[in-house]
Amino acid sequence: MAVVKMRDVAAHAGVSVSTVSKILSGSAASSQIPMHTIERVRLSASQLGYIPNAVARSLRTQRTREIGVVLGMETYPEPAALTLDGAFLLGLINAAAICHLPGVVVYPREENSVIADVSRYLDGRIDGLLVRSSTPHQEEQLLRLLANSPLPVVAIWTQDVPATVGYVDVDHFAGASQAIQYLLELGHRRIAYVEPAPMFEHPHFLARYQGYQQALIDEQIQPRPEWHVVGIEREKMRALLRLPEPITAIFTPNDIAAGEVATILQSMHLHIPADVSLVGFDDIVNAHLIAGGLTTVHQPIQQISVQAMRNLTALIAGAPVAESRTVLATSLAIRNSCAPPPVQ
């Protein structure tokens, strides 16, 4: 396969070589270039598979030993951006130290510019890239483009990756199932699943819902349609509690949703867990402050971060991709938001 040169990108984009150089180098002069031209050049570079010379030199000679990180902090509404992604970032910084790496290079994500951004990961500054999945469509596109580059890549929080990409994820299905099994052991038989939006547009939340369903079915309990609530609203919570057979526990697919549910229940003068038990998922940094101490499925963020760093360094060293794919177990953090169901 012929090496794509800067002049090829220029011809494809219909601009001069100097314009391509300014745009792809990120020089200050490119600020005078119209945005539509910048986007066209970056798109051409990605489509042609252009790789800056610095990358080839780095791969042939020495490595920087620096790891790039792409997080989804811009795509998560607060306060989730300050909890889950913040925890991942701290975990990855600690993981770099554990793996004796000098540090991480964090790449801010620009909205709607996944294709345009690919070239910045290929400038030779980093030896490999970690991509934390938060918005599947964007990450799928980014991973697909990077899969054809020489840059080793490991995805965090997804298993839907190209053949050349490693990953680290947790077992979302088993985690949700464990949470429901705990409620069943306490005596609950009418357990609602309350989510802010339909499956959050992410496969993980579908897996959590399926884990919820299967745990009930395994106990010969058929999940009822009215137990599945989309949208955390006062009237919807009231409807759950006014069913002919009211629910006695609520499971949410993340802790932010659990906090919103807790706020509504408390505004209705209901007590957690005396009136309703509540379980979340993630075990975010403030989970112990939700509902007097939220029982939740714990994602081992530090372990995920270390494993991701190890998987990536293994890929950089030439290990097979299959050896850089890991699914970790979750655990249940039991606190104060669950109790046996109230006597009817």
Task: Show the residue positions of the predicted features.
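Alpha-helical recognition/docking segments in bacterial nutrient-uptake
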Residues: 1, 5, 62-181, 240-246, ...
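N-terminal helix-turn-helix DNA-binding module of bacterial transcription factors
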Residues: 1-65
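Short beta-strand elements in bilobed, periplasmic/extracellular small-molecule ligand-binding domains
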Residues: 96-108, 193, 209, 213-234
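Hydrophobic alpha-helical segments within soluble ligand-binding/sensing domains
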Residues: 168-194, 231-239, 297-317
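An alpha-beta-alpha
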Residues: 177-221, 324-338
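Short acidic capping loops at alpha-helix termini that bridge into adjacent secondary structure
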Residues: 189-190, 223-226, 271-277
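Flexible loop/turn connectors
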Residues: 238-344
